[in-house]
Structure formats: C-alpha cells, structure tokens
Regions:
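Extreme N-terminal, non-catalytic leader segments
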Residues: 1-10
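NTP-dependent small-molecule kinase module
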Residues: 4, 157-223
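ATP-binding Walker
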Residues: 19
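Post-Walker A helix-loop "phosphate-sensing" segment adjacent to the P-loop in P-loop NTPases
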Residues: 29-38
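ATP-dependent small-molecule kinase phosphotransfer cores
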Residues: 40-101, 108-111
C-alpha cells in the first residue's frame, strides 16, 4: 500500500508588498482544511483593521530581538525598517500533526528556510504588472510617498530572486490565484519522493516471505 508521509508539507509563499499574499492565503485556506497558516511576529505597528494574534503578533523591537537571541524564531528578516519572523514551536507542532504549514514571509526569511529545509515548497506571488502593483499600494493609504518609493525599489530587486523558487503564480484574479496555490500543493504532495511504501499488515509480509523462501527452495532442488 502506498501512503503519503504523515508529516505535513512546509510551504513558503513570498511576494512583494501589494502582491496580494494575505488575501490569496485566506481564500486558499477556506477550501483546503488541511492548510494552516503560521502567524508571523513583527516589530511594526498595526495597520488599521489588523488584530494582534490574528494578522501578526505585534511586539516591540526589543521584544523581537529577545526572541531572536533565545532561538525562538525559525527565520527572520528586516524589511522596510521593521523586523518580521516566524515563531518556531507552533510550526513544528503542526507539521508533526500532519497539517500543511504555510509561511507567508519575505524573501530574506524564505532563503533562510531554504537553507534549513531544502525539501520545503517555495512559491512566489507576482502582481500582473508593476503598474498594477503601484496602484494597489497607493490604494492602501498606509505609506508615505517616500515609503512607497522604497517598496517599489525593493519589489524590482525581489524579481531577481524568482529562480530560487519552485513555482510562480501571477495574481491577476484572486480566486484563480488561490486555486492555483492549492493545486500546486496537491500536486507536490503526489511526488514520488514525498510518499512512502508500507506493508498492508504483518501477516501479508510473512506470507510474501514464505512464498519467496519456497521459490528459492524449489530452485535449489531442481539444480
């Protein structure tokens, strides 16, 4: 009998600010009940409508650095002047339970994950165009003009990191992008190197061994 490995799949989703990572992730989780999103820790201030423990764990820069020193983070990055990181314990617990864990993180953190977990699945989310990316960021009204220019500059640099990812999804339509994310996860879990072969039960194994022994004995007699 063939079965998938019990441990869940570690999935990394990256993309520039305004690419729609969080929205796509939320939609994907609605139809994929085995997908669990890790909540990141950040030192940035909450935006309007964001909740602590739901969107992020919002902490001070000092508190973040304390967690970093204690080894409590799976990865971390400093982006646009703020720290972002993934708490370690909850991720491992969910993977061991068989849940597929999705990390929505910046490229710096993703590359750290790739070094430590090369078998993880890496997906990059792109906006349909840089023009559309600028439009989306401006609609948020959360950054100053200077901050927007900084994010545009970072986005251009991030595109050069695409070859380090396994898949790219162009987020032209939210529902379609979420469906593609789940389709990639499903296909990836069907790869030969992600499954294991096991015997149906011990009695079947013994029966097989007995038949092999008899066949070898018959060959020796015929010789």
């Amino acid at each position: 009998m063939i079965r998938t490995k019990k441990q869940g799949l570690l999935i990394v989703l990256s993309g520039s600010s305004g690419s729609g990572k969080n929205t796509v992730c939320d939609l994907a989780k609605k139809t994929n009940k085995n997908l669990w999103e890790s909540i990141s820790m950040t030192s940035r201030k909450p935006r309007e409508g964001e909740e602590d423990g739901k969107n992020y764990y919002f902490v001070t820069e000092k508190k973040f650095e304390e967690n970093l020193e204690k080894g409590n983070l799976l990865e971390y990055a400093k982006f646009a002047g703020n720290y972002y990181g993934t708490p370690k314990s909850s991720v491992q617990k969910m993977l061991d339970s068989g849940k597929d864990v999705l990390l929505v993180i910046e490229i710096q953190g993703a590359l750290q994950i790739k070094e430590r977990f090369p078998s993880a699945l890496f997906i990059f989310l792109l906006p349909p165009s840089m023009k559309e990316l600028k439009r989306r960021l401006k609609l948020r009204h959360t950054e100053s003009e200077e901050e927007l220019m900084k994010r545009f500059s970072i986005a251009y640099k991030e595109i050069n990191e695409l070859p380090k990812y396994n898949y790219v999804i162009v987020n032209d339509e939210i529902d379609e992008a979420a469906n593609k994310l789940n389709a990639i996860i499903t296909a990836e879990k069907c790869r030969v190197d992600r499954i294991e072969e096991v015997y149906l039960d011990s009695e079947e194994e013994k029966m097989h061994e007995t038949l092999v022994d008899k066949e070898l004995e018959n060959k020796r007699v015929n010789l």
